[in-house]
Each structure stands twice: as C-alpha cells, then as structure tokens.
Curated annotation (Swiss-Prot):
Subunit structure: Binds the proteasome.
Region feature (Disordered): 1-56
A Pfam family: Cut8
Species in which this protein is naturally found: Metarhizium robertsii (strain ARSEF 23 / ATCC MYA-3075)
GO biological process terms on file: nuclear protein quality control by the ubiquitin-proteasome system; proteasome localization; protein transport
Descriptive protein name: Tethering factor for nuclear proteasome STS1
Phylogenetic classification of the source organism: Eukaryota, Fungi, Dikarya, Ascomycota, Pezizomycotina
Single GO molecular function: proteasome binding
Length: 301
C-alpha cells in the first residue's frame, strides 16, 4: 500500500492560471478586430489623402503672381503715363510746343501726322478768343483809351488767330469750296462783333481784318467760279450770304463782292437780288437740266 501512495501530494493547476505562456492581459477578439479595422481605415485614409497622392504631389502649386515691390521706399518721379494723366489740355499743349521747338523734326512729324482741323473745331478756337475779348471789356462807362488798352491784348490774339487759321481753308490747301465758304462765313461773323471805337486810330485792327477776309472771300469765289461757272455759288445761297455780310460791314467787303459779280454776273445783272423769283427758278432749273438754250421746235415736225 505504501507503494501505491506518492510521497508528495499531487499539484493541481490553479483555475486562474493558464498553462500556456501568454501575455498578462488578454485582449478581446472584438476589440482586436476593431483595432485592426481602425488601422486599416487609417492606412486607407493616408493612401487617399492629397499629400500621399503621387499625381497631385508631383504637380507644383500655382500661386498668384504679386507685383514686385522694392524693399527700399524712396522718393522717385512719376512714370510718363501717370505724369501725362495729370496734365490738362493747355499744359499738354505747352509741353508739346516746347518739345517741337527744341526738336524741329518732331514738330514736322506732328504737322504731318495730326488730322486736319474741321471747320467747327477751328471756329470753336476762335470763339474762345472772342470770349476772352468780351470778358476784358470794362463794365460801365469808360474812356475809349482805357477800354482799348484793356482789350488790346485779347484783341490782337484774336486777330492773329484769324490770320493763322484762314489760310488753312483757302485753295489750294482746301479743295472744297463749300468748306472754305463755311469757315469764311463764321470768321466774318466774329469780325462783325469786334468793338467799334470812336477814335479812328483804334479801328485799324477791325479794318485790317475786314480787308483780309474780303480778299479771302474773293479767292475762294474765283476758284469756285472756275468749276461750276458760279452756279454752285448761287444755288448754295452764298451770293446772298456775302451780300448780307457786306451790308453789315458797311461796304467793307468790296473785293469779295466784285469777285462774286464776276462769277455769277453771266446769269444777268442783279439776278440774286432782283427780278421775278419764279422766272429765276425757271432759268436755274433749265440750266441744271441742260435744256436752257436748246432749239425750240416749230411746226408739226
């Protein structure tokens, strides 16, 4: 019986002990799967992120261009385009005139390249001179001497402008008689508005202006008469216009009136001011149609 009994008591494993070697903390299978799933999702997010995408990471980022500014802020002159923006018409004209005076070749290029002034633009400039003249006239009663010396400077400026603009609209520079006559009509109206002083010595500016404009009228009328035999002058009413100007000037446009009489005199003496209007229109219509002076048929043939 002693043989059957072991001298040492048997050792039974404790129910809390694991006979296999394992970590001290056991992990739940569900928790492990959750961790593995989160890690897989994290890996997928990293794969789909823009930073890990090879197509996007290889493309350089486009940034808006910025104006390069100097780090050093110092005073400097305006650029030419900005400077020109600050100049009005008078200042810009003065700068251009000085530049052309210093460099005549530039002035010639300006003369060739600039568009020809229209009649309206030229008369507008002359009207501005006339306004300055009227503004210089003193208010109230004053002596002729005082008035003359007050308006002398703007008066001479207007006369000089008339002398410069008038040749621009005379033949052969201007080939259209209507354009020339339109300018002369407006210029003559300005001369009518020049002041009249009692002393004859102060009237020489206006007298000289009338003489110059009368010769200009005569030149244009003579050239126009060569083309249409004076018919265009009469049909356009320029003979009537000149007659009114001559009356308003006190007969100072005699040279122009003589040229007009020579150009339209073949129509009959006093055709523009005398005679039956219906008869005159009949003659003009026959002239325009080419039937004036044609033989008249007599008899049945």
């Amino acid at each position: 019986m002693n043989v059957l009994l072991s001298p040492q008591p048997p050792v039974f494993p404790h129910h809390h002990e694991n006979p296999r070697l394992s970590p001290q903390r056991s992990v739940s299978p569900l928790l492990g799967m959750s961790n593995r799933k989160r890690k897989a999702d994290d890996d997928g997010d990293e794969t789909m992120s823009p930073l890990s995408s090879p197509a996007i990471s290889a493309r350089p980022l486009v940034r808006p261009s910025k104006k390069v500014r100097s780090n050093e802020l110092i005073g400097r002159p305006l650029p030419l385009p900005r400077l020109l923006e600050t100049l009005d018409a008078s200042q810009l004209r003065m700068v251009l005139e000085r530049l052309c005076e210093r460099h005549p070749d530039i002035g010639q290029e300006v003369v060739v390249g600039a568009p020809r002034p229209s009649v309206l633009s030229a008369l507008d400039v002359l009207q501005d001179y006339h306004v300055k003249l009227k503004e210089a006239i003193p208010y109230g009663e004053s002596s002729p001497e005082y008035t003359y010396y007050r308006v002398k400077e703007p008066l001479i400026a207007l006369i000089d402008a008339l002398s410069d603009f008038t040749p621009q609209y005379l033949p052969p520079m201007e080939t259209q008689p209507t354009t020339s006559l339109q300018f002369l009509d407006g210029a003559t109206k300005l001369i009518h508005d020049l002041p009249n002083w009692e002393p004859q010595a102060y009237r020489h500016h206006k007298e000289s202006a009338y003489d110059d404009i009368s010769r200009a009228w005569a030149l244009v009328i003579t050239e126009a008469g060569k083309r249409g035999g004076g018919l265009n002058l009469h049909t356009g009413g320029w003979d009537q216009t000149l007659s009114r100007h001559n009356e308003q000037s006190g007969g100072r446009l005699g040279t122009a009136m003589s040229a007009m009489a020579s150009s339209v005199g073949w129509m009959g003496p006093g055709l523009s001011t005398q005679g039956n209007p219906s008869e005159q229109n009949s003659i003009l219509n026959r002239l325009m149609s080419g039937s004036y002076g044609s033989p008249v048929r007599v008899g049945p043939w």
